[in-house]
Amino acid sequence: MREEALESICAALSISFTEDPDHLESIIDRFSEIFKVKDHLNQLRKKCEKFQTFTLEIRPVGSSNCTENVYAYIIESETCRQLELKPTGTTKLEIGSDKNVSLKFGLSQKKDSTTSKKGLSRSASLLKKLKFSDKKNLDELKISIFPLDIAVRKNINLGSGKSTLLEMKLIRNDHRNMIQCLEFDDFLEMTRSFHEWQAQISESELYDGSLGDPTFSMFYSIAFFFEIPSFVLKLTEMTCFLVWDDEMKKLDERALADVSLKMTACESEVDLQHPLLSPALSYLNDCTCNTIRCILVPFSTEPFFPPVSPSRLKSINVALKLIADICVLDVWDEFENLANPSNFLSSELKKLLESSAERYGESLKKQEFNELCRTILNLWMSLSNESQPYYIFFHQFDINYIGAAMLKLDKYLAESIQISLKCQLDLLNLRIPTELENFTKTTMRLFVTLRNLLNMVEAFHLPECQLFHFEEWFTDISVFWTYSWREVTLQMVERTITLDEDGDSVKYGARRPLPAGLYSFLCIQKGISDDLARLEFTFPHHLVVCAASVVNIMCQNINAYARKLFSEAMRNHEEKASRLVRATNGIEQAMCFVEEGYRRFAQFQRLEEYVDVDDLSAVRSTSIRLLKSTRDTCEIQVSTLLSHFVNLKTDIVLKIAKNLCADGKESNSGLKSYMRELASSERIESILECCYGLVDDVRCLLLPNCFKLSTQHFATSLEQQIRKNIRQKQPAEYYSNIYVGFLNILIFKRLKQMYLKFQIALKYIYEFLEIEDRKDIELLSNLHLNSFSTKDLILSYYDSLCEKIDRTRFGNAPHVDVHISYVKMVDEDTISIQIKLIKMSPIEWIDVISDRVDYFVRLELFPKILFPSNKFESPTTNPMPQSTRPQWKQLFEIRVPLECFFLRGACLAISVFDHERFIDRLVGRGFISLHSVPQASEEKPTQRLQVPLLPNDFSDQNNVFYQLLKTRACRDSIAKEFIETRTRRHQRIRALQHYIRINRNRVGHMLLG
């Protein structure tokens, strides 16, 4: 230790224990032993005297004030000093550092040579004079007997019979400011010396860190003298203990704990500006860091990662307890520029953790694929179940346990897995199903484990690492998962419960019968969806491949399940009807399940989030196409099953058909004498009841779509039975009764309740026959047409002809321009039709017979059954000779009864003829429906109408009404007359064409001229 520091310590001890001289001597003696300064102790003490002096204050008391020329004599060992006292007030006598002096008082005499001196004087000769003068008999006072800082009054004999009362007080002067302050190194060395000396004299094997007496008094007196805070003192003791040399005597661990506890307790009282605090903290940091290195050396090979058991942390946690207490001191936060042991501890622990993770990563490279997969799975499980204590332990040192370890492990993990996957792909034999299945199970489990690891890593907001892109490692593998899904699910579908093991359908209660194996089938499809959802794909390649594959696999499973149900239902069995129903409903329910949930099953929501628009559109269109194809295939099988089911209901259908085809009388003819004749309404009620029963039974058995398909088969079956039982060549009333008899009877009776009942029944019948809004099936259309009267057929013929003309574009066909409108007559029972013929379009035509053309127009009302020729005239224009562009500009008026004008089928025919010698040749004919004629208006004139001229036999051969009239002509006079009229006209036209062919040569010479 520096000599200046020893001097300061000695001075501090001297001043601190000066009041107890005996104790001071023992303290100084202990000081010389501890610091080994016995050989020059006196020199040190002599140097320290300057730091402590004494002053005696003297003051006269009362009325006996000092007279002039009263002197005080301070007698030392070799010299004497004198000082004249002040008559009033306080006189101070500086004694010096040695109190072993005497004090005398006396009066000064004029003959005394010393009287001429004023103030304080000091000389050896004065001491001699004092000894031999008359003052030698004066009272002598020992300064050492005076108490410090206490006033003492004493009556002083001045000689010559004089005395005075003086009050004297001895004051000690400590010159602390002159003592050099201890530097931290000196204070640290002093502290170390105190504890080492105490440890040497201690009789126990372990040093507990407690200082004995008077060492304890010395240590704390020095600290108190130099105003060193308790916190700095404890910091210094802590640094001494941290670097303690155990070869001298081993330090008890309780010493560190005790100092740490006291250091924490007095931390709040520390003066942050104290000059020793900063160096003390700096040195403590160095010692702590060195201690941390020593503590962590035994743990350098400890496997901190992956976590195994919390017990492994117990030893290191105990070892770092004291260090942690030092690191968490609040005072570190006040000195940001100083190094902090907590940062060093964190970095060292992080190195240990990363080293452990690196060793673990190196071990992954040496493992086989299956072992690697098991290791990664165990890693995930240990992180999930055992990492919490490790996370808490490292978190207290500001270390992200999982994050730091996974960042170090990342490259090893990525390299090991990618190499292993590539090797497995190269070795995979697709011809061995078990090998493929094991490969897919292992890789899928590995994928899920990596997904879980990634989710854990993402929760700690780590920077980008290779694990974030682990899905790309499986780019060539995900397709094998779909193969495995397909094979496994197809096998599971084949093992579902058969219809033979299903039991009776009665067990389903009020629900529609379903096969018991359907639930297993639906669970299988849900399992595929769950597997896909568990993978949580974000890589577009996987999403596209697996989404399309899942839809395809489900469609294949539906086809397999449908084939299974179809083959089982088609077997001969006593409950075949029930089996057919269950199989049909099972196929339909399976299809509906996939159709309604395929977007959810195939993770379309993820597709929309991670896949671009083109790929998403491709997957969507592919899925829709697969589902449509599967639906079509299933409906074919369902249709076949339903056709067999309908065949089992033939008796009911036959009964309905026979009742529909009966004329209402023949069923009662045999019982006429015994029973009353059934009314038409009763017969209809019987038919409806039969329909009710059949429709309700089928509806309760089949799912809606299956029921709809079954109606097609029932309609076909009913049509076949009606065709077998319907009578041919019957009056229209017969067919009308079959088609609309229900409605006519109920309307004529005007029974509202029965009418509503009929509407409900008719709705079921239409549903049963799949007739929507009475639109046609073939049989119903035929019945409808045959129920028409001959008059209605003729009207329908002309109405259809007019509609077809309106809908057809005839291109360059000739036409007639007319203005047409109607006016109601005053009596309002007659309509006046006004037709103004304008012109006709140009016609390139030469009559081959007369070599000329003479066009004229005839206006006729059709049909003739409404407008007979003897009652309705046919206005005719004059022929226009030799004109291919005739213009008539004639106005005609035709009157029509009001009830006929708005009747559909009533029409006006504009016929253009070429006048001939033998017969007028029909050039063309146009038709205008009377109900389409606009009403005349003064505000808005009628527009010109172009009426196309068509051949006479236009649409006759293809018109269904014409063909029906032709068939009915053999038994109906009106139809016969209509057909014969048309036939004669066609014959005349054909005769003209025959004449032209015969005279072709003559006509040719005429043309050549």
UniProtKB/Swiss-Prot annotation:
Lineage: Eukaryota, Metazoa, Ecdysozoa, Nematoda, Chromadorea
Name of the protein in its database record: C2 domain-containing protein aex-1
Domain C2: from-to ranges: 812-945
Reported function: Involved in retrograde signaling from post-synaptic cells to pre-synaptic neurons, probably by regulating vesicle exocytosis in post-synaptic cells. Acts in muscles, to regulate the localization of synaptic vesicle fusion protein unc-13 likely during vesicle exocytosis and thus regulate retrograde signaling at the neuromuscular junction (NMJ). Regulates anterior body muscle contractions (aBOC) and the expulsion steps during the defecation motor program (DMP). Probably by regulating DMP, plays a homeostatic role in the uptake of triglycerides. Regulates locomotion.
Highest taxon listed in the record's lineage: Eukaryota
Tissues expressing this chain: Expressed in intestine, body wall muscles and some amphid neurons.
Membrane spanning residue stretches: none
Gene3D superfamilies: C2 domain
Family: Belongs to the unc-13 family.
UniProt-listed SUPFAM superfamilies: C2 domain (Calcium/lipid-binding domain, CaLB)
Species whose genome carries this gene: Caenorhabditis elegans
GO cellular component, one term: exocytic vesicle
Gene inactivation effect: Severely constipated due to absent or weak anterior body muscle (aBOC) and intestinal contractions during the defecation cycle. Reduced uptake and accumulation of triglycerides. Locomotion defects characterized by mild body thrashing. Partially resistant to paralysis induced by acetylcholine esterase inhibitor aldicarb. Reduced enrichment of unc-13 at presynaptic active sites of neuromuscular junctions.
Gene Ontology biological-process entries: defecation; egg-laying behavior; exocytosis; lipid transport involved in lipid storage; locomotion; male mating behavior; positive regulation of acetylcholine secretion, neurotransmission; positive regulation of defecation
Alphabetized UniProt keyword annotations: Exocytosis
InterPro entries for this protein: C2_dom (IPR000008), C2_domain_sf (IPR035892), UNC-13_domain (IPR052095)
